[in-house]
Each structure stands twice: as C-alpha cells, then as structure tokens.
Amino acid sequence: MIRFLHGADFHLDSAFGALPPGQAAARRRESRELALRLADYVNKYGVDLVLLAGDLFDSASPFRETGEQLAAALGQMRARVFISPGNHDWYGPNSPWETVNWPENVYVFKENTLTAVEVPERNLVIHGAAFTGPEQPESLLAGFTAPADGKRHIGLLHGELDGAEARYGPIRREEAAASGLCYLALGHVHKRTAPLTLGRTVCAWPGCPEGRGFDELGEKGGLWVTLDDGAISAEFVPLARRRYRIAVSYTHLRAHETSQDLV
C-alpha cells in the first residue's frame, strides 16, 4: 500500500488586495503557516509521499523569507516531497526553485518536459514537469506513455483538462487515458474535483488549501490518496484555517419566493 498527500495552489504571498493593509499582511502570515500544518499532518498519519502540483507561490519572485519558510516546513516532513511548478510560480534561474536551499527530501521538477524520478523502496516512479514561463500552451502529457515495467507510475502536473484556454498546460482526455499512469496529480483548478477515471488513469485536482476570497468558498484542503493492489481511493483532507462563506438573510422572504430566489 502507498499513501500520499496531493496538494496544490497554495499561492503564498498573495496580495489579498480586497482587505485593508493590516488584515492583508496578517492573512499572508497565516498563509505561510499552511505548510507547517501540512507537515504536522504528514508526520502524524505516516504519509509516504507528498505531491504538490504547482502554484505554491503566487508569483515567480516571492519574498525570499517565504521560500525559506516553505523549505523549512517541507524539510520537517518524514516523507519525500515532489513539486511541479505552475504558471504563477514557474521555474527560472531567479525563481525560488533555484535560489532557495531546498532540503534533501524535496525534489523540484525543473524541465519543461516530463522527467522520471524513481522511488525504489515503493516500486514507484513519479513523472513531473515544470512551467518555465507564465504560460504553457502545449500539453506536457502529449505523446507520453508510461513503460509497462511492473512499476506504479504517477504523474504530477499543473494544468487543466480540455481547457477552453490553451494557455495553462491543457491536457486532452485521450492523452490521460493513453498515459499508462495509475494516478495523475493535477493543480491549477482551485475547486476540488471528484476523481475522474480516463482509461486506467485516475485524475484529480485537490483545489486550493485555503480560500483567498468569496470566489473560493467552502472547505479547502488536499487529497489523501491510497494505492492498494491496483485500487485507488482519494479522500478530502481539510487544511484551511479560515473559510469564506456568504450569509443570506431570509427575513424579507415573500410568500411566493423560495430561498433559491435569494442566492
């Protein structure tokens, strides 16, 4: 059995521009604590791997302190960590993926093509790739098929499935179905999705782990994924410290109206 945590879209150092400056600064500080909560969870429940599918930073040039804090938190995890940078935190020579000293248990994919990293103790291979600019119009999964070598193959990418906008790593359904991956860990979509099976590949987005505004409502977190004898399950893990909600008053609801009329 293999157990891993799938997360994405932390967007550390977001501006929180809708808030007053003091509150925005407080929210940024709180956001940096997310990785520490994640580390506590990983160590408490014995996760084997952590897969982070991009946009951990809100830009490719966050405060150095933020990168160092994230690296320190990931270094506390008693698990191997894999990261595929996305369109906000794309890899470049001056990005935190190059300038921050990442701990030994963290592997950052830096190539714009799929790279394979073996996890021999788990008979597992992780395939990942990085955005190397703010846009990625071509699919990073195009033409890929995992070898039939008896190992379990997992993909880690930032992107969208059948996206109308072909700018952020669009992946076609037929590419996922032909990939031979047992699981495709995705980022970019901030709303958690139910696992989708294409061919033999299970695809999922965990959504963002912390809402940043009223366009990101409800519970937020990551996915606890279990691979056991070919069976794959993905369960939601709440991680958010705060939750955005919209309150609706029914005080002035008229007799012919329903609650849906107010929403």
Question: How should each PLM-predicted stretch be described?
Answer:
Residues 1-68:
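N-terminal active-site segment of His-dependent metallophosphoesterases
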Residues 16, 137-140, 233-236:
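Short, charged, solvent-exposed linker or helix-capping segments at domain edges/interfaces
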Residues 49, 58-204, 208-219, 226:
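His/Asp/Glu-rich metal-coordinating catalytic cores
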Residues 202-203, 230-239:
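Short, well-ordered strand-loop elements centered on a beta-strand within folded domains, enriched
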Residues 220-222, 244:
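Short hydrophobic/aromatic beta-strand or adjacent loop that forms the aromatic wall/cage
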